Amino acid sequence: MNKRITESFTKGKAFIPFITCGDPSLEVTEQLVYAMEEAGADLIELGIPFSDPTAEGPVIQAANVRALSGGVTTDKVFAMVEKIRKNSSIPMVFMTYANVVFSYGTERFVKKAAEVGMDGLILPDVPFEEKEEFDGICKEYGLDLISLIAPTSHERISMIAKEAQGFVYCVSSLGVTGMRSQITTDIGAMVDLVKKVKDSPCAVGFGISNPEQAKKMAGQSDGVIVGSAIVKLCGQYGVECVPYVKEYVKSMKDAVRED
């Protein structure tokens, strides 16, 4: 288990923002990390852009297109993380797709991610049954391979939870990422099932966009993950987005910490 990830859940309910690297630019992404940390983020998910992000809705898909057409590469993302690590020790995990890792070379990717100071990896398109080829390498280099658990059978939730590292990413609804007006999944029951098997922090993501939802989800879990609503601000304000994102993250963090 990565120490930094574990610690990010020890200070109360965690708020975990997601941004796409290089949207609007890698320089702005770096500034966003510092701003979100100042606003109270406990852990940050960095998306490495990919041409076919199957788990993403239109907002994050558009961000991937913008980042790639701006010339973002995996190596440039690594260089940016290295720069961030000179100024910040906030826990950070990559969220990307198996193809990004494969095309870079799996061991080369994981080794480099660990070297530049990343703490974990989320691969939403790799099912539990196929995580073996990443699992051993991640453990070898001290990177937590974060499991996603979607609304599914009790047996499957227990099976995935048993092998969880870092934290468990509880997917609030089936389908792609994006902002939803209501979340119907019984997150509390899902979290209880995980906890029966393993004492792992559970953070909820997919579909959370406003403070009311964040507060509700934090009440049933250990933390809240928000992506599309933040990426939407990056798309809307471009290079001017940093203060808007900072303000939004602060409002969400405040909601998550309300008792």
What kind of feature is each model-predicted range?
Residues 15-19, 44-46, 92-96, 121-123, ...:
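Hydrophobic faces of well-ordered beta-strands that scaffold small-molecule active sites
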Residues 77, 192-200, 209-215, 219-259:
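Alpha/beta catalytic cores of nucleotide-metabolism and tRNA/nucleoside-modifying enzymes
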Residues 37, 48, 61-123, 256:
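Active-site beta->alpha loop and helix N-cap motifs at the rims of alpha/beta catalytic domains
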Residues 69-72, 117-130, 144-152, 158, ...:
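Catalytic beta/alpha-barrel core
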Residues 26-36, 152-162, 204, 208-224:
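Catalytic cores of alpha/beta
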Residues 41-52, 118-122, 127-130, 172-179, ...:
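Glycine-rich phosphate-binding active-site loops on the catalytic face of alpha/beta enzymes
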Residues 1-19, 80-86:
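N-terminal amphipathic alpha-helix/helix-capping segment at the start of soluble metabolic enzymes
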Residues 62, 70, 158-196, 233-235:
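Glycine/Thr-rich beta-alpha phosphate-binding loop at enzyme active sites
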